[in-house]
């Protein structure tokens, strides 16, 4: 799908493809997008690369309370800052979880 601004109207207008996930990428914020599954579930996602490595995706959360396009975009901005600092958000979360278990 083409890049567009992720808004409530965008979310309501996208119809699922019965055979594959659909991704709609935000044209204002690099890596921020919306994933729609074949069953119609919608989630905000963030796609990134750390130091030229492979592309990775992190699910921010499902569409709906508390995740609005605005709150999800702010979270994606926070994650983008981590990526620019060379921090992999997925690995940082895993490491924090490992430390809590010890």
Q: What do the PLM-derived regions correspond to, one by one?
A:
Residues 1-102:
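Basic/aromatic DNA-contact patch characteristic of tyrosine site-specific recombinases
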